[in-house]
Each structure stands twice: as C-alpha cells, then as structure tokens.
Amino acid sequence: MVDLATVDYFSDQAVTQDPYAYYDYLRGCGPVFTEPHHGVVAVTGYDEVLAAFKDHESFSAVNAIGGPFPPLPFEPAGDDITEQIEAHRHEFPIFEHVVVMDPPAHTRARSLLAGLLTPKRLKENEEFIWRLTDTQLDEFIGTGACEFLFDYAKPYATLAITDLLGVPEEDRAEFRRALGAGHREGQHVGSLDGTPVGLNPLHYLDEKFSGYLTERRREPRGDVLSSLAAATYPDGSTPDLLEVVHPATFLFGAGQETVTKLLGAAVQTLGDRPDLQQTLRDNPALIPAFIEEALRIQSPTKIDFRLARKTTTLGGVPIKAGTVLMLCLGAANRDPRKFANPDEFRLDRKNVREHIAFGRGIHTCAGAPLARVEGRITIHRMLDRMRDIRISEAHHGPADRRRYSYEPTFLLRGLTELHIEFDPVG
C-alpha cells in the first residue's frame, strides 16, 4: 500500500498512470493544500479552481505550462510581484504564446483569435469533418481492428486542423509525418525528470506559418489563416507577422493534443462500456453528452499552473505572492461537492457541461468548439459503421484486468496506445 503522503506528483510514474487516488488524498487534506515536495499549492476543489481561473488580477498565467519547472527566475519580494513578473517574463517557457500571457497583452493577443473558430465557420467546415471521418475510417475498417491513436486519432486531428486553417494540400502529408514522429527538441511538456519545456517548443512551425500568413496578407483566400492575417488589434493597429504566427502555431499544435486525448478516452469508454454503444446508436442526440462526460472524467489536461502575483486568499487559505499554484482540473472535475458519484461515467449527468476540462475565464481553450465537433462526428460515424466495438484483450487484458498505459507526464492525460477490435457494418 503506497503512502500517498510521500508521493511526489511531479516524478512518480505510478501517479501518471492513475492520478485519481492521489487527487482524492489531496482533496481530503483540503481543497487548497501545499504539497510537501516542491511547495506547490495544489488546488483540487471545483469551486476553488474556478475561482483561481477567474481571478487573473491575483493569479498570473506566466507559468501555466511549466509550473515549478524551471524555478522562478527571481526571488519574489513583497505582496505584489507584478513588476518582477513583467521584468522576467521572457525567461518563462513559451512566453510568446497567448496561453501564458496576462492582460493587457493577453487581451490583445486573444483578440486576434476572436473571429477564427466561430460557430458559423465551424458549421461551414463540418461537411469536411464528416468526409474526413469516413476517409480516415476507410483506411482500416475492413481489417476489423486498429491501434486507434496511430491509425485514426492522431492523423485525423492533424488533417482536421490543417483543413480548417487552410494549410496547402501539398504540405498536409508532411505535417502528418512530422507530428507523428515523436520527440522534438524542446518538447518536454510535463516531463517527470523535471526538465523544463523549451522557450518555444513550437518553433519548428514558425517558418511554415510565417510563409502561409505572408501569402494571405498578399492574397487572401477566405480561410482561417486569411482571417488571422487580416486581423487587427482593438485599437486598429496591425500586428507584426510573428504576433499572428504564434496564435496560429499554438492553435495548430495544442489543439491536436486535446483532440487526440479526447478521442482516445471516448473510444476507450465505448470499448469498456458496450452497453453505451447501442444506447447512443438508438439515440444519437445523446452523443454530445457522452463527449462532455468523457471530457469530465478523463480531462485531457490534468493540471494548469498559476503564479500568485499578489498576496491573497483562495478558499479561505492564505496565498503569498510568488506562490506556485497547481490547478488540478482532473481533480476538480471529480469533486463530489460538484458532481455526484464523480468516478462513475453517467450519460444522464445533468450538470456535465459545467466541467472545466477546457479551463475557464479568459484562458478558456480557444479550440474547445472544434474538439467537440470532431468528437461528436467521430463517435457518430464509428457507431454507424461498426458493431461490437471492443478493447483488444491481447493488448489490454480481459475486462476485469485491463492494462492501459498513459503518457508519462504530470501535465496531460492521454493513452499511449489503444487497440480495438470491431465488426464492420456492410
């Protein structure tokens, strides 16, 4: 029996595979609790995580990706360290990307994304998503089996975002190969060895997207990249090229991670809960609720970080300026104070849309609407074209002794592989 009080969340391999007992332990110590190994304040309560997300005056997103790694590049001094944060911002991981910005810079950068993934544009793109879903399923459906992440989820997520953005057809195969190639320099996101993520792990995309956006500024094409190339700041000024390249590359890279992990969790649930398959076939209107519950119970982003810029309180607990906070989305979405029987997958959960898998407040995930569309259409077509979707016992063991492997990262929650078998329809 593991003594959870001794567990180091940031290096323990077992916790990456199943973090939920540890989250329960932390929550039992209090919804706002300082873990002993790194002095990080773990926020596990739903209300408390929500409050931190919404209070960007007190909590900076400057360390949202790295948390305690690397350590702060300065020694916090006083009850308001805003000036110190701004003086050292360029020393934090991915400092040029919107996910770690604070207002007013965040407000300006986010304004460039405001008109991109609108309901109207997603609706216009939906016909392509339906076609892409079938095209990707066609690659393996006749075999009655696949490794779902490699054969479907990863290429599908890449091709969906390349089409929506307007990446040229001739470059799409290259992106599919590159993004399936594994490790790239600077891509230590949530590494268990304490290695910090590089200052810009998406730099490999900058040259390509600089070219695309330069072309769109010269010759608009009516796609998302053209809208981004033409975007102006609220004051009417035109962004520099890199100021539009970075939102594009972040949307392109980070969005695929979220979609791939969501699809893996959803299909894993279908295989482990065969009773849900016919329920969803009989009533496809329940598929959106199924996707939301999959997001809640297996949040693709396990944690997000904040840095207290001011001495304040959270959930009645004093927080000193300079404190690193770990907002545990995976724990908050299973907080029994918010979600009844939180460890159960329930298709009829009335408040499921209140989960915070995509964050909340000014940093709500910009790609969330697209992820939901891709999840809904994928499950719909899989249920149409397959019967008896089941988890491969040869790879994952029998139903009562499943063996799943998750990515060894403290930040994200995603399977490393998912082997399924099924009976093709027709």
Over which residues does each language-model region extend?
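Cytochrome P450
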Residues: M1-G426
